[in-house]
Amino acid sequence: MNKRKRTRSRLDIVYTILDFLRLILITVVAAVVILVFVARKEEVKGTSMYPTLQEGESVIINMAANYVGDIKRFDVVVAREYRSDDLWVKRVIGLPGETISYREGVLYIDGNKVAEPFLDKSYVEQVKSRTNTKYFTQDYTSEKLGRDEYLLVGDNRNESLDSRNEAVGPFKREQIIARGVFVYKPFSKARYVGNGG
């Protein structure tokens, strides 16, 4: 009888260890799936989205959100630039079928004036003063965007290579791989950056 209890006790220990190992395996597989298909860690390079995102900040890109709902104006998105295969974080200004223009620093969509509430007003004034320019965003007019095209622009207009540049142009929907980013480093500035409208 005593021998049977010891054998059962050993089996209980083995089953407990196996359950623990199974839990670890499931956790590792789930983490790999999340990191490959749902989220991705990146570091902000450059100042094209300053002050919204700052150079050197570490972010988690939310690729899953890309498959839920439509891309909206002023969403912050991550897009793959075809020429370099680099990932660019930009803001959606123009949607398919629209004509976008900036005149005297003001955004117009299909001829209608549209406010850009996400722009940091103090930074805009600082840049205009430093560069001795009247407008934060220089004049620009797009062709009518195609049915699958988006005009992506950096928040730091004078420092951003984006859709306004003829060499870049509009981005296709298939190039947009994620919507929204979560800044996690430095921890003191942790925040979600998504829709600015």
What name fits each language-model region?
Residues 20-26, 42-46, 144-147:
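Short, functional N-terminal and low-complexity linear motifs
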Residues 19-37:
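Hydrophobic membrane-insertion alpha-helices, especially the h-region
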Residues 33-49:
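Aromatic-capped interface at the extracytoplasmic side
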Residues 2-16, 51, 55-197:
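Soluble "head" domains of membrane/secretory-pathway proteins
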